[in-house]
Design a protein with these regions (language model features):
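Charge-dense, helix-prone N-terminal extensions
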Residues: 1-113
Length: 113
């Protein structure tokens, strides 16, 4: 059985699902948000994993105490993935620009394919 914070999901639904590029789905059984067919953002245990340009991911890992490398199911670290862990779900609103950057990054990658 997968564990995730349903309050986080409610806030992310509000933040993300108004964007016409974003659709909901699942990743390893966890709620996830896709841009086209590519995973952009997902809930995982007590946090939110997301894919970003490597430079942004590195900067957040160095400067933001709420971020850690995203390693779902014990997988190795990935240079473009981070996890944001917040206790209060409403605090994810402060990361709206980061979520938008993830969506744009995934969309641009698909345009280049």
């Amino acid at each position: 059985m997968v564990n995730f914070n349903r309050d986080h999901q409610a806030v992310l639904d509000e933040i993300l699902l108004e964007n016409p590029l974003v659709g909901s789905g699942k990743m390893f059984g966890y709620p996830a948000y896709y841009v086209g067919k590519k995973l952009s953002i997902c809930l995982y245990e007590e946090g939110v994993g997301l894919k970003l340009p490597a430079e942004t991911a590195t900067k957040l890992l160095e400067e933001d105490e709420n971020t850690i490398p995203f390693q779902p199911l014990g997988r190795p670290k990935m240079k473009e993935w981070i996890q944001i862990n917040l206790d209060d779900s409403k605090d994810y609103w402060q990361y709206t620009e980061v979520f938008e950057e993830s969506i744009q990054f995934i969309w641009e990658q698909q345009q280049q394919s």
